[in-house]
Amino acid sequence: MRRLKRLVFVGALVVTASVTAAAVATTPGSNGQIAFRRWLNDETSRSALYTINPDGTGVRRIVPRLRRAHDDQPDWSPDGRLLAFSRFPDDGPAWINVVNSDGTGLRRVTPRCTRKPAPNRVPRGCEDAANVSFTPDGQHLLFTRATGRVRQFPRYEWDQIEHAAVATIAIDGTDEREILRLGRYAGDVKFPQMSPDGRFILFERHNSPLRKPRMGQAIFVMNADGTNVHRVTPWKLRGGDNPDWAPDSSRILFRSQEEADAERAQFYTVRPDGTGLTRLTNFPKKHRRVFSASFSPDGAQIVYARANDDRERGDLWLMDADGTNHRRLYAVPAADSAPDWGGLASSP
């Protein structure tokens, strides 16, 4: 099945369940390892997940790569003991995995598809599950799932899935529930993430050609039970690329111009009510492009991926939380991106 592009619109919203959460995801001063994705070929069709220490040492592959698939979207559990990620096969729907921080105990969380879906349809039981993140209690995962028929929009070079939803599931694969579902062919959601205090869920919304502004993109926030959905970033910024909560839940970190003009991308923060929009960076155009970012657990630093003017491939960089003091963390010939900064692993 051709990988579906993901768009977002919250129209004809149906609230079906709530998610409860406990403590914050990480505690101040508990900076642990950074997980990230490494592209293994120039076509960005093969990738694997790695971890690295905050000082740039200890790079290692966290889980063996499955043939004819790529692993993406790593997210640490609040206690730093587990890593959740999405696995995208070449032919078929994506699914969610969880693995121990040392690379052992790999297990599938979302259900296995028992039949091969048609190229233009994703039936129930074969939902495309991706964009995973832990809830603050460490026992559940938020993710997006897509199902239904695929509608093509040739003018926009876009394939739109019929139904898209934000859902939650226990890490043992039980208790799967929807939090919200979008209207038919209205768009799709990406990267739902619950605030560390458990009050809110952020997500990206990309309008389909059927909604205005057509192909628009912005970040939205809703209550943890799926109510009070509201936009927090201007449409013109096209904010997204795996937004991240500050450890104290006060701000949302995001990149502008996702999937639009990457050479004009900058990092911003905004409050969950949409106020306090602050630009953190002033990259010149010659920096080529930047990618998604993640707060450190103590809230003092940010890790992000950046392709310099002399390199087309991304390296991992650090900056202070106010957007200053940029320094390269690690550089290799491969392309590294999609970092997630975890806390120090606690004892069992």
What are these regions (language model features)?
Residues M1-V8:
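Bacterial N-terminal signal peptides that target proteins for export
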Residues R2, L13, A21-P348:
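Sequence signature of WD/YWTD-type beta-propeller architectures
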